[in-house]
Amino acid sequence: MYSGSSDGESHDTSTQRKIPPASSMLWVRNLRRYIGSGAGLGSEALMELETKRILLEIFKEKQQKSQEAGTIPSFYKKKPEEGSISQRVQKLAKYRFLKKQSDLLLNADDLAAMWVCLRENCVIDDATGAEKMNYEDFCHIASVCTEQIGPKCRRFFSPSNFMKFEKDEAGRIAILPFYLYVMRTVSLTQARIDMSELDEDSDGFLHSDEMESYIGGLIPNLAQLRDMPPAFNQMYCRIASQKFFFFCDPHRRGRACIKKILLSNCLQELMELHQESEEEVTDTEQAENWFSLTSAQRICDMFLALDKDMSGSLCKQELKEYADGTLTEIFIERVFDEHVRRGKIVAGNSREMDFDSFLDFVLALENKDTPEGLTYLFRCLDLQGRGFLTTADIHSLFRDVHQKWIEGGNYELCIEDVRDEIWDMVKPSDPLKITLGDLLGCKQGGTVASMLIDVRGFWAHDNRENLLQEEEEPPEEESQ
């Protein structure tokens, strides 16, 4: 009995050993080959199979490239063709992403509610009267704001954000700087979303027409621009846009990086126009703000006054009348050589300066102390195009200033003394030449440039002590 059972088990075992594995069977191999080829499958199954194959090939190709390239980034990314599926998918993905980011932003009501929460849950500093909060208050306010506003405000109440602000002896921070930080973050994020929506090719850069569209969309929300005549809108957007490109597109490629725009002072200057009442802003401040309506109209009127023949562009003779004719002739010549676009010839005459080039010209003269303005002017001062100025260049440049100075009835000057004074002001690293880096490093580059191109600029430098006294006198008279 036991032996019979044992024989049966041994018989079954021997039978199992004789059965070949499924993978070695001919019909299994044929079936796998048949399925792998895709023959007999429906159209949907074939499409899915083909999609998997393509994705696998793309993955293997990228994996191989990344292994070969190591840490070297790719410098060129081919943009999808116009109207292609890739472009449509990219636009849809960008739209959904920007919509999601926009939904996460705090709106005006949310910001107002946050300010109320901050004020209701802070403590008053006995010494200064400032409203402050410690970390426990900070966490409590975070909970209250989350209940009233929602989870989208939670990211502003992180420990790292609390540590960013200056603390007093008790470890408290003022609520106003924190609230201003929240407002600025929301404002910049909203600006980035708006600019990204206008960025048609999604490369992180805006072209001039896209920048003008962005500014045009802001006009209804800027208190000081609401009364702008509709006919002036397009011209205003052009004038405002040019400042962004002057400072954010130094190589004049016709496109400005969105990140640079957001970090530039230009955007902050534009946002100053949010101030409701004009009483908060003096006439001087309005004139100094490039984006104010007063400034834009001034620049437009200036160009029209210079354009005697009403051709829409300026010749050298017309530009010489700028600033009451105080700019030197050699400087005007150099401006046309370096910054007026080639091929702009009117009625067989020499090149003429269009409105965009005129805006750059004005921006450079009004922002001489900035790296961008000084770079523009240095190209004009560099008579030989060598990247530096010699004593001979200084002599040639100042000779025209000297002539206008004498014609104005001023005392006689020694050009060599002025040249030596400029050298003392700049203190160049190489005693024989002045570079752009030297002018930027000495912090007086704008003054030096004014002395060499504008007789009024030299007069201001020569009378700087008297001008300082005049600025200090009015407060003394008022106090008396």
Swiss-Prot record:
GO terms for molecular function: calcium ion binding. Its main location: cytoplasm. One of its GO terms (cellular component) is cytoplasm. It is found in: Cytoplasm; Cytoplasm, Cytoskeleton. Residues 186-221, 294-329, 369-404 form the EF-hand domain. Keywords: Calcium, Cytoplasm, Cytoskeleton, Metal-binding, Repeat. Ca(2+) binds at D307, D309, S311, S313, E318. The keyword NADP does not apply. GO terms for biological process: cortical cytoskeleton organization; microtubule cytoskeleton organization; preprophase band assembly; regulation of dephosphorylation; unidimensional cell growth. Widely expressed. Interacts with PP2AA1. PANTHER family: SERINE/THREONINE-PROTEIN PHOSPHATASE 2A REGULATORY SUBUNIT B'' SUBUNIT GAMMA, SERINE_THREONINE-PROTEIN PHOSPHATASE 2A REGULATORY SUBUNIT B'' SUBUNIT GAMMA. This is Probable serine/threonine-protein phosphatase 2A regulatory subunit B'' subunit TON2.
